[in-house]
Amino acid sequence: EGDSVAACMKNWGFELPADATEADAFNAIVAKYPSLAEAVDAEKPEGTTFTSLLNDYETKYTKGIETGTSAANISGIKKTGDYSMTVSLTQVDATAIYQLGVTIAPMHYYGEKTKYNYENNQFGFDKGDLSHVREKTTTPLGAGPYKFIKFENGTVNFEANDSYYLGAPKTKYVNFLQTQEDDKLNGVVTGTVDITDPTFSSTTVDAIKAANKNDDVNGPAITTDTVDNLGYGYIGMSANTMNVNNEPGSDASKAYRKAFATVLAAYRTVAIESYYGERASVINYPISNTSWAAPQAADPGYKVAFSVDAQGKDIYTSDMNDEQKYEAALQAALTFFEAAGCKVENGKVVSNPEGGMDTANYAIEREALIPADGKGDHPSFMILTEASKALEKIGVHLIVTDLSDSTQLWDTIEADQADMFAAAWSATPDPDMYQIYFSGMDGKAAGGSNYMYDINDAELNQLILDARNSLGQSYRKTLYKSCLDIIVDWAVEVPVYQRQNAIIFSTQRVNMNTVTPDITTFYGWLNEVEKIELN
């Protein structure tokens, strides 16, 4: 999760240093899949090349666009002035605007003025001829506040672009340093770094307070700005492996998963408070709190995740202490196991839904995978271990496997062999749920991450499409609440936490009056970097 290269690559099973670059990510991919690079770069002994293995390579893969009888222009794109245009769509799509974040380049750069005649559908180049574009590959053009000067000894040097459209930046030079995670905070303290983004752990907080000498994360040495991370942590279950009679969407299968989810959910608060302290909060729906579609406690129909039994009765009361809540969760789990078809006697599960035993010693035995570096270093590790101890009391064996290599997690999920797993999602500004929860219908393919949970619900699919086809935020929020209720009912995802990210500034060297005020999850200090001045 998160925005760093290392965090993003971890979601795909790659362990990289905290300061990994995009080049490091590419090299890691090539290292894992060397045959791909070898096929592209070299011929096989018998003389077969990678491209020769592609059917009709010359006709299908050597041209970027179709020429000849193709359209002379795109009717939905209209020039309205020298510096303005409109884009029209064939249908309403709330997510379309996020697909239009394209880089703007002047015609004199990508084309030739002599070949431009808008009225005659000439746009500065010969259609299908990319030679002029390729000439610019080694001479990039940008319009940002700073110009790239060089990369040397782990430092990227930038110089102010005096022609920047919002005005020349106040600070002439900006350097970006390759830095190890452990060196970020120390760099600000010692004066080698002015702005950075350390992992906002308890250790980091204590070190910031020590530097400020005032028991506060804001002070004479360091100023801290925190925002909610664009994403959330969860514990997932595969509907294809965690079900009854190979019917993932049946009531019995949902009850089976809810039995586990109810116990897991009970330990979220103690685990997250232990791991993050005040820097994270427990969430009750599988959506980041940064989203406008996230349900709020005051909203009608809001429920604490997995807080009712199989009969729909609330299992917690306001006067319960933690131990009483854990016991209530166990008793509720037994009602769900019974609803799934398990036999329960004397407060224990004595048979699985099929009437037998999963193993010689346990009626039910399942495994939860967690990439905690083999040492329990993960926000959800305590949840799983405490839930495992609790489930043991009712005759259910939950194996918690702590993976030192997270690649095993993603490989197991993709192979459809994982029961439960702890992970996190990176979110997007729009709450569209197609990618994760849409299982395919009416000729539309399933979302690319649907395999994570294997959820397949016709009503959910339709709600996702309906929400895409509206621009009304209130209406879409209502639809997404219905989507979230269905996802919770499937019990394929236990929402766990919303954590914070931190940006720290050297109070001594950065003029904080010039830094972007009211930094948010979606709008950070870099959006107004041209305004920043040093003291």
Describe these PLM feature segments.
Residues N157-E159, D251-K389, K531-E533:
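Append "and occasionally in soluble cytosolic enzymes with long acidic Gly/Pro-rich linkers
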Residues A94, T262-A305, P379-S388, D411-N535:
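Detector for C-terminal structural segments
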Residues G154-A210:
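Ligand-site clamp/hinge motif
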Residues E159-Y164, V227-A255, V263, I272-E273, ...:
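A bilobed periplasmic-binding-protein/Venus flytrap-type ligand-binding module shared by bacterial periplasmic
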